[in-house]
């Protein structure tokens, strides 16, 4: 270690390094080795929850625990401390006459943040706190930096997102939120596996962005000397697997979109896409409701959930409404009668709906009305179906009214949580819609996709009638953990350097 590096350290860091070197001089590895423990903090509390101080003394049972030293107090020959593991904390009661002089020195010189292993008797203090009365301490790993201020946890937002490891150490609420996220994803997998779906993996690097309306990240493959994009969806590859006969598939994976960041958007996020052969959007609507209700029940229990003071009746059947009916209900404007694009634009101007250059059809205007007036009213879980064909390039047209598609989006608390439809399996229709998207791209629509000829070719081999679904995992996690920003459910959100 250079003198220059030592000079850059603050007093606490210097002292901790001196302690590290002192351990090494005593023949103790400052960064330890394997340590076998017999219980964690939660197991101890569960196993001995109903035992009194006297009963524990009579039992005389021992346990071996390990974790990070979070508090330490006492002087002379007796000390107390709290050890933190993944499940929580357990108190330590350390007496010099129980552990011996050398062991007690390890305890005395241990810093907050150090990892130690403890063997001892399970007991309860006079105050009633379950504890381990140590008979042996083992130094496991030295912390060379002091932890954030112990009484208030980590509160600086910038540090929380940049140094998630410190947030997890200091804020139990944050730690538990990410445990909930893992449990939620596991339960979604369990639900779909139980319905005989196969989990698959598809490429992250694509030759052409497709499967969604979004701006991609562009990268370069040096060996092949070609530009590639990070996927904006998993859809087109998953549907090729349906062509290949897999029938029921899903993928949970990272999606990348080179777009703005806000409370509900991060450039890198997690989605699940699900495809089921011989199904339509109504079957997928039922599947979506099942997935979300199963996940909610697994992590929140039965009944409604609270989100920022609003009771969400997630346990009840979700409302279902056609987009045109929803617009009429909120604005009074009726798009059921057929009209020209000029008439639709006049209605938009009358209602002061913002117009874009690529709004070249009535369908675009209908979608703009919905986004402007209806989305903000959808608080309880609501399936909105019947999107215009112009904004649904991969969805099948509704056979009774071909202006619209057999597509739905799920809205909760005014935000979209799922997007699904009866998949377009007509390769000729698919190519013409890709061509319309390419034209919109030329007119300035950055989110329009190009033409994926390989996918069109795959469809030409035949794809059975299929229903497909995409759910934003991060938003669902926000809902089920009662958080208002996506950064609080991403372990490592995108940050400026």
Curated annotation (Swiss-Prot):
Top-level taxon in the UniProt lineage: Bacteria
Subunit structure: Homodimer.
Gene3D superfamilies named among the record's database cross-references: Bira Bifunctional Protein, Domain 2 (3.30.930.10), Nucleic acid-binding proteins (2.40.50.140)
This protein's UniProt keywords: Aminoacyl-tRNA synthetase, ATP-binding, Cytoplasm, Ligase, Magnesium, Metal-binding, Nucleotide-binding, Protein biosynthesis
HAMAP family: Lys_tRNA_synth_class2
Cell compartment(s), UniProt: Cytoplasm
Cofactor-binding details, from the entry: Binds 3 Mg(2+) ions per subunit.
Record field: transmembrane: none
Annotated binding of Mg(2+) 1, by residue: 409, 416
Cofactor needs: Mg(2+)
UniProt cross-references to PROSITE patterns, sorted A to Z: AA_TRNA_LIGASE_II
Family: Belongs to the class-II aminoacyl-tRNA synthetase family.
One Pfam family linked to the record: tRNA_anti-codon
GO cellular component: cytosol
Gene Ontology molecular function: any one: tRNA binding
Enzyme class label: ligase
EC code: 6.1.1.6
Catalyzed reactions per annotation: tRNA(Lys) + L-lysine + ATP = L-lysyl-tRNA(Lys) + AMP + diphosphate
GO annotation, biological process: lysyl-tRNA aminoacylation
Protein name in UniProt: Lysine--tRNA ligase
Protein's gene: lysS
Sequence positions that bind Mg(2+) 2: 416
């Amino acid at each position: 270690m250079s003198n220059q590096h030592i000079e850059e350290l603050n007093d606490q860091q210097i002292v901790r390094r001196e302690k590290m070197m002192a351990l090494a001089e005593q023949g103790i590895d400052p960064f330890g080795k394997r340590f076998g423990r017999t219980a964690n903090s939660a197991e101890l509390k569960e196993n001995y929850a109903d035992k009194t101080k006297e009963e524990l003394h009579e039992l005389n049972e021992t346990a071996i625990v390990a974790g990070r030293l979070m508090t330490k107090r006492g002087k002379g020959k007796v000390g107390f401390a709290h050890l933190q593991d993944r499940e929580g904390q357990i108190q330590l009661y350390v007496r010099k006459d129980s552990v011996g002089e050398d062991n007690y020195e390890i305890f005395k010189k241990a810093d907050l943040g150090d990892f130690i292993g403890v063997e001892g008797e399970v007991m309860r203090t006079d105050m009633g706190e379950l504890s381990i009365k140590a008979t042996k301490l083992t130094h496991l790993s030295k912390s060379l930096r002091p932890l954030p201020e112990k009484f208030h946890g980590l509160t600086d937002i910038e540090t929380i997102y940049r140094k998630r490891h410190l947030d997890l150490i200091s804020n139990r609420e944050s730690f538990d939120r990410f445990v909930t996220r893992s449990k939620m994803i596991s339960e979604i997998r369990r639900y779909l596996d139980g319905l005989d779906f196969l989990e698959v993996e598809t490429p992250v690097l694509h030759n052409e962005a497709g499967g969604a309306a979004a701006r991609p990240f562009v990268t370069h493959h040096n060996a092949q000397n070609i530009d590639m994009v990070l996927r904006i969806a998993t859809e087109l590859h998953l549907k090729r697997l349906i062509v290949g006969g897999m029938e029921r598939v899903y993928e949970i994976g990272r999606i990348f979109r080179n777009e703005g960041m806000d409370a509900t958007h991060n450039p890198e996020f997690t989605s699940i896409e699900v495809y089921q052969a011989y199904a339509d959007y109504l079957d997928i609507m039922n599947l979506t409701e099942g997935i979300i209700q199963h996940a909610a029940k697994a992590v929140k229990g039965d009944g409604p959930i609270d989100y920022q003071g609003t009771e969400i009746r997630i346990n009840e059947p979700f409302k279902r409404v056609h987009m045109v009916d929803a617009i009429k209900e909120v604005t009074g404007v009726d798009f059921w009668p057929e009209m020209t694009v000029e008439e639709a634009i006049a209605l938009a101007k009358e209602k002061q709906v913002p117009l874009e250059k690529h709004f070249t059809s009535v369908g675009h205007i209908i979608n703009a009305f919905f986004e402007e007036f209806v989305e903000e009213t959808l608080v309880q879980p609501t399936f909105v179906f019947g999107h215009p064909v112009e904004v649904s390039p991969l969805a099948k047209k509704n056979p009774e009214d071909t202006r619209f598609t057999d597509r739905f989006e799920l809205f909760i608390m005014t935000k979209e949580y799922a997007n699904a439809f009866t998949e377009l399996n007509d390769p000729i229709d698919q190519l013409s819609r890709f061509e319309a998207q390419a034209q919109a791209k030329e007119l300035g629509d950055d989110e329009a996709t190009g033409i994926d000829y390989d996918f069109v070719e795959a469809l030409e081999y035949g794809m059975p009638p299929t229903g497909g679904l995409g759910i934003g995992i991060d938003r669902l996690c926000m809902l089920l953990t009662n958080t208002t920003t996506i950064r609080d459910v991403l372990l490592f959100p995108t940050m400026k350097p």
